[in-house]
């Protein structure tokens, strides 16, 4: 289903929360043409056509109960807090605990996706959905009994699984990889780095982004969804703990 049709079909739909409260999503006011121009000027490139279409329809979807929060925001565009991972991002949703679902925005973007879950506890990056339409459908599923599906899997299971997994490949093991991208990326990184190839990720796949503390160095192979993180000594981590640097 197209994103526009999904958004229109969501408005007015009855949802049942975890506390058995009934909520109804409503469309926010559309974003003005002047605001869209302002967003594109800030980005330095045109908004993806699908996003522009949605913004002229509604700035987002909100619920009748303000305490439940705004589940979907189509206009939340800013620089990613992890600039070594993503540049400009749309944050369509947060979990209320400081963790965000984000979509990287790029010039000439045909698909408004994928959607990633950026979590700080544990500090991981997790693949959520291939596009915003799928994410919205999954989010609606999560907001209705039995409250299951990909969103619940990522929040309740994948974060822990990604934090504890050992699938990240030491940079030294890819110096002579048959994959040109991985080989070039590995040779550009210092010793002690680990690489995670998420080009063909499935919901729940991901990479720890704070394996060696809050200042863990991160890198990305150009525009590809191939990421890496560097190791830090115990002394370096202790310095960060006491000084924040």
What is each stretch, according to the model?
Residues 1-111, 147-245:
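A surface-exposed partner-binding patch
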Residues 113-150:
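Compact, glycine/acidic-enriched structural inserts
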């Amino acid at each position: 289903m197209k994103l526009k049709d999904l958004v229109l079909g969501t408005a007015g739909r009855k949802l049942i929360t975890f506390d058995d409260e009934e909520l109804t999503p409503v469309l926010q006011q559309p974003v003005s043409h002047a605001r869209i121009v302002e967003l594109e000027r800030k980005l330095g490139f045109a908004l993806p056509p699908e996003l522009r279409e949605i913004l002229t329809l509604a700035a987002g979807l909100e619920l009748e109960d303000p305490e439940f929060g705004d589940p979907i925001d189509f206009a939340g565009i800013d620089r990613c807090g992890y600039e070594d991972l993503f540049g400009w991002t749309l944050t369509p949703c947060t979990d209320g605990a400081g963790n965000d679902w984000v979509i990287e925005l790029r010039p000439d973007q045909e698909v408004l996706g994928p959607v990633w879950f950026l979590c700080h506890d544990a500090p991981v990056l997790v693949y959520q959905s291939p596009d915003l339409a799928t994410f919205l459908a999954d989010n609606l599923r999560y907001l209705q009994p039995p409250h299951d599906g990909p969103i619940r899997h990522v929040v309740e299971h994948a974060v822990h699984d990604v934090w504890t997994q050992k699938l990240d490949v030491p940079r030294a093991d890819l110096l002579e990889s048959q994959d040109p991208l991985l080989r070039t990326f590995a040779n550009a990184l210092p010793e002690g780095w680990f690489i995670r190839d998420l080009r063909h990720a499935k919901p729940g796949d991901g990479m720890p982004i704070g394996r060696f503390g809050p200042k863990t160095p991160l890198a990305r192979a150009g525009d590809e969804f191939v990421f890496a993180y560097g190791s830090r000594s115990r002394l370096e981590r202790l310095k960060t703990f006491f000084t924040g640097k």
